[in-house]
């Protein structure tokens, strides 16, 4: 096996974004959050890399319109998807679901030898995505 073959088999496959992940869920199909950012942090900046297969839950803008947001990372630790359980106080731009809940899937491209990620246009939550973040949507429902 040449060095290039070895590298491609054992190294490169672990450092490229795949979008594939095995996020843990409970019996009801709700995602198990691996890291929760405390509410005292006023503005959490989402990391583009984290622990592989992890889910980070953080809060949007504090106050009466607070929402839970979730960041999902793929099997190699790249940001794969974000689910926002509200409209970020911008209902005209987020006409999704009951509360403006929506998903942003990430696309990764290689430029000049580095992986660059950007979110694709926001989308309505699928039933599977809605089930994953059930707790965040219920939290939003209690604010009425």
Ranges and model annotations:
Residues 3-144:
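Catalytic toxin/effector domains delivered as secreted proteins or via bacterial secretion systems
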């Amino acid at each position: 096996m040449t060095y290039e073959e070895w590298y491609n088999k054992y190294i490169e496959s672990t450092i490229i974004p795949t979008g594939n992940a095995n996020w843990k869920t409970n019996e009801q199909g709700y995602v198990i959050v691996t890291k929760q950012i405390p509410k005292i942090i006023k503005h959490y900046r989402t990391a583009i890399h984290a622990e592989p297969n992890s889910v980070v839950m953080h809060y949007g803008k504090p106050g009466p319109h607070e929402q839970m947001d979730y960041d999902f990372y793929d099997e190699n630790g790249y940001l794969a998807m974000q689910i926002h359980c509200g409209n970020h106080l911008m209902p005209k731009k987020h006409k999704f679901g009951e509360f403006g809940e929506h998903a942003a899937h990430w696309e990764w491209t290689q430029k000049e030898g580095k992986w660059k990620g950007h979110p694709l246009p926001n989308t309505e939550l699928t039933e599977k995505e809605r089930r994953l973040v059930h707790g965040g949507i219920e939290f939003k429902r209690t604010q009425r």
